[in-house]
């Protein structure tokens, strides 16, 4: 029997539909129609907001585990499952700067996860090691290094074999030719952890980079005579992830950025093993990460990822930044889906689509979620 969800404001990926019902049959959306025209049987009132389930393209871990050179397939399943429990239909598990051996292990793991059809696994995000140590953030500077021909060959092969691959790199550590080769192999090249100039950033984007990693964090900032990487992102058209916890980027700066870029900026959590748990401490490459008052930091106070969920980020955008709910919801679903070329699968509620959806309350807290296997 069909399930008929009533009483919610339905966000279909573009607009809110009030007074409508969403009908689900066999795991798919069968119809969205005025409540007066909806079937009487199978009705269930779900006050709140029904919206497309989320995508998160930067998750370093979850469920008590980090993605690293020791993660096995069960561990990767656990990471993905932790995020699905938070309403996120798909993630790019993210490996931060590590050894060549660890990188090769994680790539092989990702290929195995794709073959095993791990629920929620969209591909991989390799954040480093080809970064600028001047903008290392919480990455281990001893492991940061320029890209070699061997690195490039490994990454291009991974891009061809994985369903999706995002590679965060700094233009200082990879040439335009290497960036072009990566993009040509199908990787989403994202600029980050970089102190590059505006001109260097533009050259990297011209070569094929089409995204920036955690906008404003660990990158050259906007100056009146030196616009930096942040300026190149805001003046151009690349995608850009944004950690909207109100800590990594001030709400006023987010407001300016979103005013400059009507499209392209999307939400990420940059979360760690803490996601979906009550953990208060963890180890990161032998260094302790502390979870205190909504912050994740190393002992010296350096931010080390975010203690954030996508519903929380949406609430920050709406309540603190002043962004319309429609846009905030798109930033957690349709916009990242489009960056990965998955707009026909995620980000929209429409007849014939899988019933991947979330139910949020009036404060954007997650109440329920429904995700395809």
Identify the residue ranges that each predicted region occupies.
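Active-site glycine- and acidic-residue-rich loops that bind
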Residues: 99-105, 172-175, 188-195, 243-259, ...
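Residue-level marker for buried hydrophobic side chains located in beta-strands
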Residues: 53-55, 190, 267-268, 358
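C-terminal cap of metal-dependent C-N hydrolases
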Residues: 8, 338, 343, 348-373
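Divalent metal-binding pocket/active-site signature
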Residues: 126, 133-228
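N-terminal metal-binding scaffold of metallo-dependent hydrolase/deaminase domains
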Residues: 1-38, 363, 369-373
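Divalent metal-dependent hydrolysis catalytic cores, especially in the metallo-beta-lactamase
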Residues: 60-62, 77-106, 119-132, 161-174, ...
């Amino acid at each position: 029997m069909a399930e008929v969800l009533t009483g919610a404001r339905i966000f279909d990926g573009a607009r809110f539909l009030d007074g409508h019902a969403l009908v689900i049959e066999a795991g798919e959306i069968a119809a969205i129609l005025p409540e007066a025209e909806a079937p009487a049987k199978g009705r269930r009132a779900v006050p709140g907001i029904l919206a497309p389930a989320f995508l998160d393209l930067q998750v370093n871990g979850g469920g008590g585990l980090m993605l690293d050179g020791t993660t096995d397939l069960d561990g990767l399943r656990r990471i993905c499952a932790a995020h699905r429990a938070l309403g996120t239909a798909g993630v790019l598990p993210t490996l931060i700067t590590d050894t060549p051996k660890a990188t090769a292990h994680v790539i092989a793991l990702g290929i195995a996860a794709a073959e095993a059809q791990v629920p929620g696994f969209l591909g991989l995000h390799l954040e480093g090691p080809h970064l600028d140590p001047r903008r290392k953030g919480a990455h281990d500077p001893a492991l940061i290094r320029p890209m070699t021909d061997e690195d490039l060959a490994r990454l291009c092969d991974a891009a061809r074999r994985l369903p999706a691959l995002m590679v965060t790199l700094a233009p200082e550590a990879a040439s335009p030719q290497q960036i072009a080769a990566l993009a040509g192999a199908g990787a989403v090249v994202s600029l980050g952890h970089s102190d590059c100039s505006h001109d260097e950033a533009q050259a990297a984007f011209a070569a094929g980079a089409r995204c920036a990693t955690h906008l404003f964090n660990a990158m050259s900032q906007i100056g009146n005579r030196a616009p930096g990487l942040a300026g190149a992102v805001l003046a151009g058209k690349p995608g850009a992830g944004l950690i909207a916890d109100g800590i990594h980027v001030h709400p006023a700066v987010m407001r300016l950025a979103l005013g400059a870029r009507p499209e392209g900026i999307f939400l990420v959590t940059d979360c760690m093993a803490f996601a979906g748990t009550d953990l208060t401490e963890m180890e990161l490459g032998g260094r302790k990460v502390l979870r205190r008052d909504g912050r994740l930091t190393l002992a010296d106070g350096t931010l080390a990822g975010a203690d954030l969920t996508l519903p929380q980020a949406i609430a920050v955008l709406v309540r603190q930044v002043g962004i319309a709910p429609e846009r905030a919801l798109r930033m957690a679903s349709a916009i990242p889906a489009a960056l990965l070329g998955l707009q026909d699968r995620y980000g929209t509620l429409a007849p014939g689509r899988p019933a991947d959806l979330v139910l949020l309350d009036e404060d954007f807290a997650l109440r329920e979620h429904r995700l395809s296997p």
